[in-house]
């Protein structure tokens, strides 16, 4: 399907779990969902995952073999493909820290890319910049006692649940600005509870916009734009969205 659309020069979008993705209510045309492309193989201290595997499933496979590295990332609700695209991270760790090789589809050709030809930065990657379709990735981990691995993952989950809203959301709305959380600026402007239609700034964590009921993609877009404008006016900085917008909103 990707090869066909590429040959026809038609635009298409790749989705995993749709984490951190705002999709137009009017539709977006050609979408390919890869969340069912699954498979995990452990080879010594390396774990090979296909793009549709969730970070939770990869963590569990690693834990089963006493491999450490994915504890901090285990609560990220996205797939491996999506995590690699945006270099997902949490608690000081990023998926790019562990990648040794990825297999991608690009220009209708399947190719393996070694670590020396990869780069990852804060919520960005060569995958995103070049439009690679990730098929699988190899992650190098380290051996550790299983009880210590599980304890760290549990601690991260406890912190996450205490800090983040339970209501439906797209995850963190904005990236950090010069290492300062966007939530700091939003909270400083007393914008918790600020809303547009069914979209509302979480009262639990200012970095999240939640769906309080019936929110549309337009509600979300208008609210996030308003937040950006207010922060720009007050602090003179431009907040960059962490979420990806697909379609016309």
Region spans (language model):
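Anion-binding (especially nucleotide phosphate/pyrophosphate-binding) glycine-rich loop
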Residues: 1-80, 84
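Short, basic and Ser/Thr-rich N-terminal targeting/leader segments
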Residues: 8, 15-17, 98, 167-168, ...
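A generic local secondary-structure boundary/capping motif
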Residues: 20-21, 59-62, 70-74, 87-94, ...
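Phosphate/pyrophosphate- and phosphate-bearing ligand-binding catalytic cores of soluble enzymes
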Residues: 21, 105-249
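Structural signature of FAD isoalloxazine-binding scaffolds in flavoprotein oxidoreductases
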Residues: 22-39, 85-115, 129-136
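Residues embedded in well-ordered beta-strands within globular domains across many folds
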Residues: 41, 71, 103, 243-244
């Amino acid at each position: 399907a990707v090869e066909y659309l590429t040959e026809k020069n038609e635009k298409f979008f790749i989705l995993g779990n749709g984490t951190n993705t705002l999709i137009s209510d009017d539709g977006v045309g050609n979408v390919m969902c890869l969340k069912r492309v699954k498979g995990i193989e452990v080879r010594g201290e390396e774990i090979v995952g296909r793009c549709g595997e969730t970070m939770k499933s990869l963590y569990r496979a690693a834990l089963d073999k006493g491999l450490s590295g994915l504890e901090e990332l285990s609560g990220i609700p996205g797939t491996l493909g999506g995590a690699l695209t945006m270099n997902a991270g949490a608690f000081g760790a990023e998926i790019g820290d562990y990648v040794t090789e990825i297999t991608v589809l690009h220009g209708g050709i399947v190719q393996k890319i070694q670590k020396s030809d990869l780069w990852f930065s804060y919520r960005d990657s060569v995958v995103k910049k070049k439009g690679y379709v990730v098929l699988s990735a190899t992650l190098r981990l380290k051996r550790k006692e299983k009880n210590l691995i599980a304890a760290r993952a549990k601690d991260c989950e406890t912190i996450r649940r205490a800090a983040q809203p339970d209501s439906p959301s797209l995850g963190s709305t904005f990236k950090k600005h010069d290492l300062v959380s966007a939530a700091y600026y939003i909270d400083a402007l007393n914008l918790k509870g600020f809303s547009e239609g069914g979209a509302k700034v979480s009262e639990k964590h200012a970095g999240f916009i939640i769906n309080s009921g019936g929110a549309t993609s337009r509600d979300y877009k208008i609210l996030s734009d308003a937040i950006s404008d207010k922060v720009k006016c007050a602090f003179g900085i431009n907040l960059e969205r962490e979420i990806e917008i697909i379609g016309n909103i």
